[in-house]
Amino acid sequence: MIRKILPTVAIAALSLAMTDIRAGQAASQTLEKIGELGKITFGYRETSIPFAYLGADHKPTGLSLDLCAAVADRLRSELHRPGLEIEYVPVNASNRIPLLQNGTIDIECGSTTNTADRQKQVSFSLATYVASPRWLVSAASPIVGTNGLDGQTVVVTQGSLNLTVAKKIIDEQKLKVTVIQAKDHAESLFVLGTGRAAAWFEDDILIAGLVANSPDPKTFRMLAATYEPSYYGLMTRREDPEFKALVDSVIKEKMGSGEFNKLYSKWFEGPIPPRGQNLLLPMSDAMKARVASPSDAL
């Protein structure tokens, strides 16, 4: 990428803007990069409905992207850069952390679970969703519980935290199960739908989003069993707590003003692109608690 050389006046204005935004803070490499290039780069998932995915116009959309857009709006104001641009870079479960670490993206706007292990590599914003993993099977399948998976093949998305969770369940219940991996959530659903796997294990909301936008949602059903909740957040670089603080302040402001609740209703309780499906998922008590008291705790 060719970097533009800023004129002296622009550099002076940028210096003043960076002084404003850093009042009481140490320097943020991410903010400096964004200010210098005049753009912020969003990493987004292409099939993580309704958090980040490609809509009817093949443009990135979703709850996480709405929140990231609010971060960009804050930067336009605080950096005095009304023309700040947004660049979109597709990421997947395998490359999202490396692309954040090497500076290809400035923030990941997806559906990534905050874990203690991942915190050794990246930082997470305040929780933006509380999920629980579940098994999805064909509606015609005789499987009603995890015992029914014995002797079967199941699919998990490559790079998903739920690969570890699925293997733990299989080991604890002493099941003989073959686990295969798909490159993304859309392929996982395809593998299940074509009969190459008897079940798909993933977070309930991601399953609901993909199924709702599939050609025939009634051909699938989730098993009743749920597991420990997980917390989604926007990912930022671990070595840049100042940028994380800015992102957190944007989310906290949205939650305090009631705007987050409106965004939640938009994506979980109303028709969403590309097919106008409604996920019909009211906010859970666990999510309500996080909105009332925003936190990035596990």
Which residue stretches match the model-derived regions?
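C-terminal segment of classical bacterial N-terminal signal peptides
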Residues: 15-23
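Extracytoplasmic small-molecule ligand-binding "clamshell" domains
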Residues: 27-108
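Ligand-binding clefts/hinges and TM-proximal coupling segments of bilobed small-molecule sensing domains
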Residues: 162-180, 218-220, 251-298
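Extended ligand-binding regions for polar small-molecule ligands
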Residues: 62-74, 147-148, 152-161, 233-272
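Acidic, polar ligand-binding/catalytic clefts
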Residues: 69, 80-148, 224, 288-297
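Bilobed "Venus flytrap"/periplasmic-binding protein-like clamshell domains
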Residues: 41, 46-50, 60-77, 113, ...
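Periplasmic-binding protein-like
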Residues: 46, 129-137, 204, 212-251, ...
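A ligand-binding cleft/hinge motif common to bilobed small-molecule-binding domains
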Residues: 95, 109-120, 165-172, 191-228, ...
